[in-house]
């Protein structure tokens, strides 16, 4: 037994959440109540920010004040993260993407620029392919694991050759909706359970704030491939209709012997993403940052804002 069992989530806000400088609110999208924060002038262009896996909306809070000088900014918690609804058995890219389509319709209510990190970057790609006509003006994919988050990708390593074993570890010992919560047992088991090349992955004495706000069933959905069972990445990229995409590609190292990837995409996968987007008629601005961590907006917020503003200004020209 452990005192972390079933302790975290919207059912127990006092144990799970902390306050933030920017106010939060919930909107009813049907299956889920989506939590979000917004700042900026209502007359400014709309910018939707989509966090990555284990990240709540407040991962963007350092970047939001500068962005709010130019946009009305909306940062969301995806289903299963932050204060948004947990949906057992329902964590798929299509469900998450359609949540965002409804959010744009009901809350933003006008054409939107979208930027997403990691799995949020994959959802940014999803929106640029499958959102309603006219909803998305332009899309930024911030270090997205396109192909690399699939179990059987069309090119390059898949989820089980990169971060996947960590997701599997979390879900095994923490359980769907934190139903097991065996944090100490997970820490003890990690050295023998994780692949040798991941032995140094940090696991603290207690859950981080990010993990408290995360449903570990997300990790299982990626490990098993159910998250993308109906959303093949190559097909999705061939379907992109948004005219402009900014693709940022951050730190990555590939083991030549095993093919294991430390990072979100290999160079080959990034090249294939660009190739498919260009074939679809998209104008792609690819920017490589091999020394920048996975979350540029988290670790280098000024760099993130500068790049985003520069790219958007170029679109206006």
Kindly give the residue locations of the regions a language model identified.
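Helix-rich cap/lid subdomain of alpha/beta-hydrolase
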Residues: 144-240
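Conserved loop-alpha-helix segment in the C-terminal half of the alpha/beta-hydrolase fold
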Residues: 241-292
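Glycine-rich His-Gly loop
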Residues: 49-52, 118, 249
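Active-site loop/oxyanion-hole signature of alpha/beta-hydrolase fold enzymes
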Residues: 37, 75-115, 119, 289-292, ...
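Alpha/beta-hydrolase fold catalytic core
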Residues: 1-47, 68-71, 108-110, 136-137, ...
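Conserved catalytic-core motifs of eukaryotic protein kinase domains, centered on the activation segment
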Residues: 59-61, 84-90, 150-153, 257-258
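Conserved HGGG/HGGXW glycine-rich cap/lid loop of the alpha/beta-hydrolase fold
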Residues: 32-86
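Conserved hydrolase catalytic core segment
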Residues: 110-153
């Amino acid at each position: 037994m452990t005192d972390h069992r079933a302790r975290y989530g919207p059912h127990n806000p006092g144990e799970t959440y902390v306050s933030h400088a920017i106010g939060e609110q919930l909107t009813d999208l049907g299956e889920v109540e989506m939590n979000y924060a917004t700042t900026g002038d209502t007359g400014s262009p709309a910018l939707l920010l989509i966090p990555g896996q284990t990240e709540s909306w407040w991962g963007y809070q350092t970047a939001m004040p500068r962005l709010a000088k130019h946009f009305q900014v909306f940062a969301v918690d995806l289903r299963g993260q932050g204060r948004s609804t947990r949906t057992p058995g329902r964590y798929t890219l299509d469900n998450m993407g359609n949540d965002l389509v409804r959010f744009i319709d009901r809350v933003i209510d006008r054409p939107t620029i979208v930027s997403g990190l990691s799995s949020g970057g994959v959802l940014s790609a999803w929106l640029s392919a499958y959102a309603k006509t006219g909803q998305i003006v332009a899309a930024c994919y911030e270090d997205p694991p396109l192909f690399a988050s699939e179990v059987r990708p069309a090119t390059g390593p898949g989820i089980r050759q990169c971060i996947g074993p960590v997701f599997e570890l979390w879900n095994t010992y923490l359980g769907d909706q934190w139903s097991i919560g065996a944090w100490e047992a997970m820490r003890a088991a990690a050295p023998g359970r994780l692949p040798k090349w991941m032995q140094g992955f940090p696991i603290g004495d207690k859950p981080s704030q990010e993990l408290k706000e995360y449903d570990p069933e997300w990790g299982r959905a990626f490990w098993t491939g159910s998250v993308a069972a109906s959303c093949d990445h190559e097909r999705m990229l061939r379907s992109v209709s948004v005219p402009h995409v900014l693709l940022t590609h951050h730190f990555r190292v590939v083991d030549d012997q095993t093919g294991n990837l430390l990072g979100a995409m290999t160079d080959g996968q990034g090249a294939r993403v660009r190739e498919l987007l260009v074939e679809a008629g998209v104008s792609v601005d690819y920017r490589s940052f091999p020394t920048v961590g996975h979350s540029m907006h988290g670790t280098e917020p000024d760099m993130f804002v500068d790049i985003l503003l520069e790219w958007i200004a170029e679109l206006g020209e």
